[in-house]
Design a protein with these regions (language model features):
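Noncatalytic N-terminal accessory/assembly modules of large enzymes
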Residues: 1-177, 187-189
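Conserved ATP-binding subdomain of kinase catalytic cores across diverse folds
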Residues: 138-340
Length: 341
């Protein structure tokens, strides 16, 4: 590429360098991401040890090492002192460890959500603001070569970057969202994931599989008539630590709907998991007399039904769709379309 198209390669390298250097997460965003990683690991341990009647509830050695290493890498100050007091010096149990991580995560979520949702791009990268004047060659919109197209004759090129970028918080991470204007006037929004998750390469292979399945669905008359297709976002790896993910504001994940429901009824998003573990520990007495796998499965079903009634009702998605529709006619049309599909 550098030999055949040196100006194109130079332009792409400059653009990738700006994204990698100028869009690094702040200290608060890094702490929030790592706190979520520690909490997810702790919840897995908590769930796995729920039916063990001989469990002493102590924090695993690996978790102690991880949280100690995390505390050592924090900048000196009140934040590091408070974190060490909560997790290192006090020697918490696994239950206390989970509760304190939840409290720290919630604090950072509130702090990050108070930030302005839109920022000026010139405060972050002056090069991207003047990209249309500083580029040496035309650059195509990222991700178009992932399409199953015969040639690139119809591919769109980057005209310029919009002067504002957005701040996103989703799935335990904070990202920046940049918007690119193409030479045909279309807008493409990309979430800058830095650092990208460790499972992102596996995720990209799944995306490619779904694109192949979409071509199969498109060839079938019944699926094409119903408009059935997988919604596959475009993921473009820039470097081992950076990738661009196509972001469409028209789509909302089930996780976001669930978190909104938990906020409305005043519970934490991890409270159903904690409640399940606590009731399992209080009910499961496998040490007193022998129990079979059938008993264990029945107990799990009973606990799931109880939590479904008290915390997670079966009409969460229905309530969300009812609130977001502009009129009852829109809701009826959506239900009709879903039924036809």
């Amino acid at each position: 590429l550098k030999t055949a198209f040196p100006l194109l390669a130079l332009t792409m390298e400059n653009m990738a360098e700006q994204l990698q250097q100028r869009f690094k997460p702040s200290n608060d965003e890094d702490i929030y991401r790592l706190t979520n990683a520690l909490l997810n690991d702790a919840l897995q341990q908590y769930i796995h040890r729920a039916p063990l009647t001989t469990d002493n509830g102590q924090l695993p050695q690996t978790s102690q090492m991880n949280v100690t290493l995390f505390a050592e890498n924090l900048p000196p100050g009140p934040l590091k002192t408070a974190f060490e007091n909560d997790f290192v010096r006090s020697k918490p149990t696994l239950r206390e460890y989970v509760a304190r991580l939840q409290r720290w995560r919630d604090r950072y979520e509130e702090s990050l959500d108070r930030r302005p949702k839109r920022q000026h791009l010139e405060h972050c990268s002056h090069y991207l603001v003047e990209f249309q004047h500083q580029k040496f060659d035309e650059v195509e919109i990222p991700g178009q070569y992932l399409q199953l197209a015969d040639n690139n004759a119809h591919f769109e090129r980057i005209s310029r970057f919009l002067p504002e970028y957005g701040l996103l918080r989703s799935n335990g991470m904070c990202n920046r969202r940049i918007t690119v204007l193409s030479n045909k006037g279309a807008r493409y929004a990309f979430a800058v994931q830095l650092p990208s998750a460790r499972y992102c390469r596996r995720e990209e292979r799944i995306f490619q599989l779904l694109r192949l399945l979409n071509t199969v669905l498109e060839r079938k008359i019944q699926t094409r008539k119903r408009g059935l297709a997988f919604n596959v976002p475009t993921a473009v790896p820039i470097s081992p630590q950076l990738r661009l993910l196509n972001y469409d504001e028209a789509f909302v994940s089930l996780q976001d709907i669930y978190e909104r429901h938990c906020k409305e009824i005043g519970i934490g998003k991890d409270d159903p998991i904690v409640a399940w573990v606590e009731k399992m520990r209080a009910t499961w007495d496998g040490g007193s007399h022998s129990r079979t796998n059938v008993d264990f499965a029945n107990l799990r079903m009973e606990l799931m039904e109880e939590i479904s009634v008290k915390m997670i009702s079966d009409n969460i998605l229905t309530n969300y769709m009812t609130r977001t529709m502009a009129s009852p006619a829109d809701l009826w049309l959506m239900r009709k379309q879903f039924t036809l599909q």
